[in-house]
């Protein structure tokens, strides 16, 4: 929350060396960092090195809920085994529409 940025490229190199994944929490950087406001990974031009990106809609987007996005091959299994996710409810359509519009404006 102080504007500090992790050295994502160096962390991704270490992760690759140790067969680990890279997860970036963009909760406080969406709408602030990056050419189009996508966050620190976009700012550092390393989005292609990130396996999982997560964030919240309750900060700069001004709604509620959150997200985790990934192209990682094991992403789908996480949706099935993560107990906090399994017991969540879908966001109401009005919240999704509000978040979508806020992201368009950002």
Please provide the spans of the model-predicted regions:
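Active-site core of PLP-dependent enzymes with the aminotransferase class I/II
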Residues: 1-19
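Active-site C-terminal subdomain of aminotransferase-like
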Residues: 18-24, 28, 33-106
